[in-house]
Amino acid sequence: MNYMDTPFTGIHSYVVSVSPGRSRANHYHEKKEEWIALAAGTAALHLVDIKKGERESMVLDTRSADYGLIYISPFIAHSIENVGNGEAAVIVFSRTPEDPSDTIPFRFDI
């Protein structure tokens, strides 16, 4: 295969670590889709649909057999809160690179 002739579309990923009692993310995107997976620890994922005002929270725990990949669509504000005693880590996947102009801060009242 000649990679010069074939367009390459990849997956962008990064790891976010969260200390106990802290929260990370606290934003939404107007264009970007993300998928997240808990890699370590126990964390609460807080979601708010910006357009509908609907809220949802769930606890993710790597010791649980039923956690997996979670899809976050545009206009869904998201926050990861470490509710465990040790460090938590989340892997974030996206089809597009990070765009600071598409990361809109959102205040969560948790």
Model features per residue range: what roles?
Residues 69-76:
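Conserved SET/PR-domain catalytic core that frames the SAM/AdoMet-binding pocket
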Residues 1-69, 81-110:
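Non-catalytic, conserved peripheral segments adjacent to functional cores
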